[in-house]
Amino acid sequence: MYGTTELIASLDLGTTSARAIIFNAEGRPLAASQKPLTQYFPHDGWVEQDAEEIWQKQKECLLGTLADLKLSGSGLRALGITNQRETTIVWSKKTGKPIYRAIVWQDRRTAAFCERLHDSGLEPLIHDKTGLCLDPYFSASKVRWILDNVEGAREKALAGELLFGTVDSWLIWNLTGGLGHVTDVSNASRTLLFNIHNCRWDEELLDIFGI
């Protein structure tokens, strides 16, 4: 029914739902699927999601749209991802399992840590390198919290056994069966760890956040 070079899939992993839409070469949507995501609020100001559910719901949406068109993944020319960019996931390189729930962009648990960095006079340096304000909204302090509060996390990170990613990285890791641990500039630039002037992870920022 469709040529194998004309279809593009779009994955949209938002805060409240996962969606997949398949478009033809003219940009006309041919099939779509959407599934809700569960949010958890264990304490005031904390917002979490199950990273496994994120992957499963997104996969179900993609497979559903392919099934509607009687296609397999090989019938797609390309696949694009849009996502909640600051949400933070840390998982085991060996097992592919998250070591903690995804900490959502709305989460404010690291406000006191960010305030200490501000009081230390580090905000101008951070802003100059990243173009961002120093705020719990972004990923860096969330990664620091996981390393400090999940048992054994920092030791495993030092041993090279853990991977960090925003939601796009987590989805690509799973879509590729663990072969691709990647992101792009638009997501990396929302972590507070990425130098926007040279487009590299910044060692000084990593040291500041203790990652």
Region annotations inferred by a language model:
Residues A67-W105, C133-S139, I172-N195:
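Short beta-strand-loop/turn "lid" adjacent to the catalytic site in phosphate-handling enzymes
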Residues T95-P98, R116-G121, L125:
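Hydrophobic or amphipathic alpha-helical targeting/insertion segments
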Residues T15, E26, I126-I211:
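Gly/Ser/Thr-rich active-site cleft segment
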Residues I103-S120:
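Short alpha-helix plus adjacent loop in nuclease-associated cores
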Residues F41-G45, F113-R116, L193-N195:
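Short, charged, surface-exposed secondary-structure boundary motifs
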Residues M1-Y100, D128:
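N-terminal glycine/serine-rich phosphate-binding loop of ATP-dependent small-molecule kinases
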